[in-house]
Amino acid sequence: MAAGGPGAGSAAPISSTSSLPLAALNMRVRRRLSLFLNVRTQVAADWTALAEEMDFEYLEIRQLETHADPTGRLLDAWQGRPGASVGRLLELLTKLGRDDVLLELGPSIEEDCQKYILKQQQEEAEKPLQVAAVDSSVPRTAELAGITTLDDPLGHMPERFDAFICYCPSDIQFVQEMIRQLEQTNYRLKLCVSDRDVLPGTCVWSIASELIEKRCRRMVVVVSDDYLQSKECDFQTKFALSLSPGAHQKRLIPIKYKAMKKEFPSILRFITVCDYTNPCTKSWFWTRLAKALSLP
């Protein structure tokens, strides 16, 4: 039941949700998208055509083909890339001539986006009152003026880092090895390790957001089975991926340092991984990681 063109059913969601991240779409909408796009036909563009429009490469698309729900995997992978948004997704579906999808799911997408906007407004209203900022490099609230051990309490000289380390408490021994290899050698990098560098007594979510977005040039994610169960690590990772396209120069670097029983997180699968478990490349591991963190 294809529409005759970019009709009214798709115009409203595109105009009102153009800048919202893909995280605004809930599982019900994603499952229905999969029902439309997973089916391979000769008369309508499927998920592979959408993947090409999203600039996925041939080998990436072939890997997605191995999954039971390739459309769902595609959306998970794409939402961490620059330019990914609800509006952009709808524009690509329009370009591919899938007006049937837009007309069928448009109201549900609009509903999800309105819920997302309302939730963001509620969270914003619950934040502490902001003080006037003279410069973008100064913390935006009084609460965040002194959050690390070397911070200026007045916020005039906020402490900065080469990388924020996202990790679980159970992985602290590897983080300590990372400190020895990257800070206490000729690399002289400066890592932000919450248990060592962050002062107690403030909101962990506000601190993480401030450090990842404003204070750290990169973010290293120590992936393990315990990481997959951590709400704090999940928030930090998704926050870093959801930053505006201009902030994606703060490259996310996933590290796998030991064997995992669970599946590697799909949201990180299309980012190059530093694999400490590979004996063939282990001797190059710290050099590669240090150079990645030293990039401008």
From Swiss-Prot:
It holds the Pfam family TIR_2. Residues 159-293 form the TIR domain. Residues 32-109 form the Death domain. InterPro entries: DEATH-like_dom_sf, Death_dom, MyD88_Death, Myelin_different_resp_MyD88, TIR_dom, Toll_tir_struct_dom_sf. Keywords: Cytoplasm, Immunity, Inflammatory response, Innate immunity, Nucleus, Phosphoprotein, Ubl conjugation. GO terms for molecular function: TIR domain binding; Toll-like receptor binding. GO terms for biological process: defense response to Gram-positive bacterium; defense response to virus; inflammatory response; innate immune response; MyD88-dependent toll-like receptor signaling pathway; positive regulation of canonical NF-kappaB signal transduction; positive regulation of interleukin-1 beta production; positive regulation of NLRP3 inflammasome complex assembly. It comes from the Eukaryota. Residues 110-155 are annotated as: Intermediate domain. GO terms for cellular component: cytoplasm; nucleus; plasma membrane. The keyword Ubl conjugation applies. Ubiquitinated; undergoes 'Lys-63'-linked polyubiquitination. OTUD4 specifically hydrolyzes 'Lys-63'-linked polyubiquitinated MYD88. Deubiquitinated by USP3 that cleaves 'Lys-63'-linked ubiquitin chains leading to inhibition of MYD88-induced NF-kappa-B signaling. It is found in: Cytoplasm; Nucleus. The modification Phosphoserine is found at residue 244. The intermediate domain (ID) is required for the phosphorylation and activation of IRAK. Homodimer. Also forms heterodimers with TIRAP. Binds to TLR2, TLR4, IRAK1, IRAK2 and IRAK4 via their respective TIR domains. Interacts with IL18R1. Interacts with BMX, IL1RL1, IKBKE and IRF7. Interacts with LRRFIP1 and LRRFIP2; this interaction positively regulates Toll-like receptor (TLR) signaling in response to agonist. Interacts with FLII. LRRFIP1 and LRRFIP2 compete with FLII for MYD88-binding. Interacts with IRF1. Upon IL1B treatment, forms a complex with PELI1, IRAK1, IRAK4 and TRAF6; this complex recruits MAP3K7/TAK1, TAB1 and TAB2 to mediate NF-kappa-B activation. Adapter protein involved in the Toll-like receptor and IL-1 receptor signaling pathway in the innate immune response. Acts via IRAK1, IRAK2, IRF7 and TRAF6, leading to NF-kappa-B activation, cytokine secretion and the inflammatory response. Increases IL-8 transcription. Involved in IL-18-mediated signaling pathway. Activates IRF1 resulting in its rapid migration into the nucleus to mediate an efficient induction of IFN-beta, NOS2/INOS, and IL12A genes. This is Myeloid differentiation primary response protein MyD88.
